[in-house]
Regions:
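A short, glycine/small-residue-rich beta-strand->loop->alpha-helix junction that serves as a flexible
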Residues: 5-18
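Conserved nucleotide-sugar phosphate-binding/catalytic loop shared by glycosyltransferases and other
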Residues: 7-8, 30-81
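Conserved nucleotide-sugar donor-binding subdomain of glycosyltransferases
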Residues: 67-104
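Donor nucleotide-activated moiety binding/catalytic core segment of transferases
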Residues: 81-91, 217-253
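A donor-sugar binding/catalytic signature common to diverse glycosyltransferases
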Residues: 96-104, 108, 118, 237-253
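Active-site proximal beta-strand in glycosyltransferases
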Residues: 110-127
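A nucleotide-sugar donor-handling region in carbohydrate enzymes
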Residues: 127-195, 213-216, 233
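Catalytic donor nucleotide-activated moiety binding site of glycosyltransferases and closely related
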Residues: 196-229
């Protein structure tokens, strides 16, 4: 029996969790309980594959115009609720605890002296693995947000370390095989940027069509830009059609 915690701040964690849920479902002797945090329960989507999943507030980050805002992040934290959730999470029924950078499960395991397996991209960011830049806040978050005993890091390259490649959900491809990519159609996924600014930039590019996904967007056509709310099926279909991708996050994209 496994407790599997998933950080819900970014959709890459959810994509990876869906792939893992499909893989683990092939072993009927294994029972998996899923716990998600990092966004409101109502903002999670396409959760049918996780059964009676649990929700906690957890820890998340406030962003604006593509950057983490430390002061706004501190203001939105609920440390009392986090500590209560961490103390009340009973791990005795579970044989294994897994955390994809999910803090409630990770800290509950540390408090109860249980080994927690960390599976995710953040666990690949060890000394010796290149990073674009280092800052004190980012290093602190990586160390303290969801500490684990056993690390299984995922990255595009191993850089001489025991790292695994990204987990891709091959079963989620559209039925009927891959679509023919349109040579001048691009998928745009910039969920932490100002969407109106991005749309204005894209509409100024002639001869191209853009399918833009992001939180808070509605399905509408705005010139050469088709906006969409985030959804698994529509996103994968647009990805199949696109010949180019514009993104600054989404590790499993």
């Amino acid at each position: 029996k496994i407790l599997y915690g998933v950080q819900g701040t970014g959709n890459g964690h959810l994509t990876r969790a869906r792939a893992m849920a499909r893989a683990l479902a092939r072993y009927p002797q294994v029972q998996v309980d899923w716990l998600f945090s990092g966004r409101t329960r109502e903002d999670f989507f396409d959760m049918e594959g996780f059964g009676a999943w649990q929700w906690r507030r957890g820890l998340s980050f406030a962003t604006r115009a593509g950057r983490v805002r430390p002061l706004a992040t501190l203001r939105q934290l609920a440390p009392g609720e986090f500590l209560r959730d961490m103390r009340e999470l009973d791990l005795d029924p579970y044989d294994r605890v897994v955390s994809d950078f999910e803090p409630v499960t990770a800290w509950a395991a540390r408090r109860q002296r249980r080994d927690c397996i960390g599976l995710g991209h953040q666990y690949a960011l060890v000394p010796g693995v290149p990073r674009s830049r280092r800052n004190l806040l980012g290093s602190l978050v990586l160390r303290a947000c969801a500490p684990v005993g056993t690390r299984i890091g995922l990255h595009w390259h191993h850089f001489g370390h025991p790292l695994l490649p990204p987990i891709v959900d091959a079963d989620a491809r559209p039925a009927g095989g891959p679509a023919r990519a349109s040579p001048r159609e691009a998928l745009v996924y910039l969920p932490f940027e100002d969407p109106e600014r991005v749309i204005a930039l894209l509409r100024a590019i002639p001869g191209w069509r853009f399918a833009m996904f992001g939180p808070g967007l509605i399905a509408e056509q705005r010139g050469n830009v088709a906006t969409h709310p985030v959804g698994r099926a529509t996103f994968v279909a647009a990805l199949e059609r696109a010949s180019h991708i514009v993104c600054n996050c989404g590790f499993e994209l």
